[in-house]
Amino acid sequence: MNTTQLATLPTAINSPSNAIWHLGPIPIRAYALCILAGIFICVWWGDKRYRARGGQKDVVLDTALVAVPCGIVGARLYHVITSPDAYFGPEGNLALIPQVWHGGLGIWGGIGAGALAVWLYLRRRKLEVGTFAEAVAPTLLVAQAVGRLGNWFNQELFGAPTTLPWGLRIDAEHLPAGYAPGTLFHPTFLYEALWNLAGAAALVWLGRRFNWHGGVSMWAYMVIYTAGRIWVEYLRIDDAQHILGIRLNVWTSAVVCLIGLTGLFLTLHKQKAFAQVGAGLEEE
């Protein structure tokens, strides 16, 4: 590659110039499209993986129809509770709470509410939760990777300033106070998306290599996602609640990571014990 070719390489990632399109009077928001695309991939791929494990057709779709609305409500409530100034502060506006199309969904509220809805729904239908969890775990990471592109369109939740060639350009209207025009920022949406895609690939490979079952992949998903989320959170500069000088989402991620590690260890240990008992019975 010669000097001229090097000079023509991009030295930054541009933010999209538009995040909203109109179909007549109806606004079509990129943020919503990214979330919907992620949900579609999760349901489509999750259904294939679930049926490959002996599950019934359309169970993943039916479960998603319950879990997604609950997850959106949970995600919004988590955001409102952890970022209260925009809604309850001196200049807050309660009317903004239901306006999710402007952004502001806390992933932990979505995961918690969605997971509870899934568990209750599957229990009601008398379906094996572990098999379902095993099937959808990697698909969640892909869905979250696609959903993160919504932050790119909205020009939000980016990281600290950087001089790296993949720094993110932000329009003047979205530029945080105190930063000069032309400042480049860490594209945390891209970091998290790539981490999640790599994590999904790892889950698929590990599941096949070690014949994971019974929800092992879901525990591993919790560990992989939270490990990535912790280092990404340390890059971000948006306003956030802090506890002992550490962002709330870092604390939440650390707790969920520990739960995932514990669940992963106990589930694998339990399955190993069952396998040893089964081998002993066969020898007899």
Language model regions located:
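A feature for loop-to-transmembrane-helix boundaries and adjacent hydrophobic helices
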Residues: 1-284
